[in-house]
Amino acid sequence: LELLSLQSTSDQTDYLHNSHIAANVASAVTPEQAGMWVYPYEDNEEHVIYNMVNGLLLRPYISGMVWKMSDTGMKRMQEGIALYKEIRSDVRDGVPFFPLGFGHIRDEALAYGIINGDVAYLAVFTPAADEVKIPLTFEKEIVEVSVIYPKEQLCEYSYENGVLHVKMPQKAAARLFRI
């Protein structure tokens, strides 16, 4: 990594398993060098969103047959890449945090974040659940929590007493939050 700016994190082709890698890899490789394959291979909106969230707090590599995507799928990918361009300096300069601890392959929910000064980003994955409670503890009071990917939140969430409660529209869903 001293000589090259990118390191592929895996050749894993199952996007659900990739989230387990995405939620842990910043413990071994700096997030901005951790290349995460983002390869929607189903033309399903939640599938595209999940794949994009896998890479947004790392270094997304776009792959797959994106020319076969529907307009909706392509717009979701474009939205994700545009967001990555907005937040990549925070990803580069931030410090990783793991509010649920390191994820294990059988975990029903995973969470991985980056904090940089007054802003934090949190990727929430529910590979085998549709709901998760995530304890959040920061030095400063949390004033606002919002879904930033996708722009239309497409999930329910609330933050009370140091816990972010997220209810996804289905199992195998993911969202990116700004805190």
Language-model-derived ranges and their functions:
Residues 102-141, 172-178:
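Carbohydrate-binding surface patches
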Residues 58, 125-127, 148:
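Structured loops at beta-to-helix junctions and adjacent beta-edge loops in soluble globular domains
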Residues 156-179:
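C-terminal beta-strand-rich structural cap/linker in extracellular carbohydrate-active enzymes
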Residues 111-114, 153-159:
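Short, exposed beta-strand/loop patches in secreted or surface proteins that constitute
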